[in-house]
């Protein structure tokens, strides 16, 4: 969902190049170790929206590094404000297209990728835009370490069914799957970190579909 343009958010991104990259040239390698100041494992959320999910994770896990990858500059600015307000040194913002994922991160550089409530692109002619289309899966496989995982959540049953089929056809393995995440065991529900969108629709009784999947050994 496209957010209304907020000039202050756009300006904030431009004012803080140390914390947010605005559409960097894919031909120029990003030195993530230098940007974070350490070599801790990196986890990426592709399509971070307003950032509730990724900022919560960053607070919960100071021993990990997180990248919020968001194509909308206004959304990136909103996430950046949360990062700065909360002093989250283990969070970087990348305002860029996920199509360039491999160029931005390199191979075997990432331990986990989060796909939360991605655009379902329901029309058949837009299949290649879905973030669980086979071409995107190939990009995730390239940047993930051998034991790295994709964690995927959606409220769209059609996208979930498509994603299960796409990942299965790609030869991936599933470590966890739920067609009603918020009614799983208490332990699973307590560990779940909600997005803004998820909280809104789950509170209305909308089932949340979820899966965790990995790739076979490279």
Swiss-Prot record:
SUPFAM superfamilies associated with the record: S-adenosyl-L-methionine-dependent methyltransferases
Stretches the record annotates as Disordered: 1-26
Enzymatic reactions: guanosine(46) in tRNA + S-adenosyl-L-methionine = N(7)-methylguanosine(46) in tRNA + S-adenosyl-L-homocysteine
Gene Ontology MF, one: tRNA (guanine(46)-N7)-methyltransferase activity
Annotated substrate binding sites: 123, 155, 195-198
CDD domains named in the record: AdoMet_MTases
Assigned GO CC terms: tRNA methyltransferase complex
Alphabetical keyword list: Methyltransferase, S-adenosyl-L-methionine, Transferase, tRNA processing
Pfam family of the protein (one): Methyltransf_4
EC number: 2.1.1.33
UniProt-listed HAMAP family: tRNA_methyltr_TrmB
NCBIfam families registered for this protein in UniProt: PRK00121.2-2 (NF001080), tRNA (guanosine(46)-N7)-methyltransferase TrmB (TIGR00091)
The protein's name: tRNA (guanine-N(7)-)-methyltransferase
Gene that this sequence comes from: trmB
């Amino acid at each position: 969902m496209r957010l209304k343009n907020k000039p202050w958010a756009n300006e904030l991104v431009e004012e803080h190049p140390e914390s947010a990259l605005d559409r960097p040239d894919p031909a120029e390698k990003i030195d993530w170790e230098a940007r974070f100041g350490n070599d801790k494992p990196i986890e990426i959320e592709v399509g971070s929206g307003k950032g509730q999910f990724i900022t919560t994770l960053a607070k919960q896990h100071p021993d990990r590094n997180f990248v919020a990858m968001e194509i909308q500059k206004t959304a990136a600015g909103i996430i950046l404000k949360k990062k700065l307000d909360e002093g989250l040194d283990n969070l970087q913002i990348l305002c860029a297209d996920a199509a360039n994922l491999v160029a931005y991160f390199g191979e075997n550089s990432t331990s986990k990728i989060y796909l939360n409530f991605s655009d379902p692109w329901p029309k058949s002619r837009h299949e290649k835009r879905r973030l669980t289309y086979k071409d995107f899966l190939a990009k995730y496989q390239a940047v993930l370490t051998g034991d790295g995982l994709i964690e995927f959540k959606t409220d769209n049953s059609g996208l979930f069914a498509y994603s299960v089929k796409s990942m299965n056809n790609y030869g991936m393995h599933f470590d966890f799957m739920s067609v009603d995440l918020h009614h799983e065991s208490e332990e699973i529900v307590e560990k779940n970190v909600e997005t803004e969108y998820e909280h809104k629709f789950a509170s209305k009784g909308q089932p949340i579909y979820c899966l965790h999947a990995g790739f076979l050994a490279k």
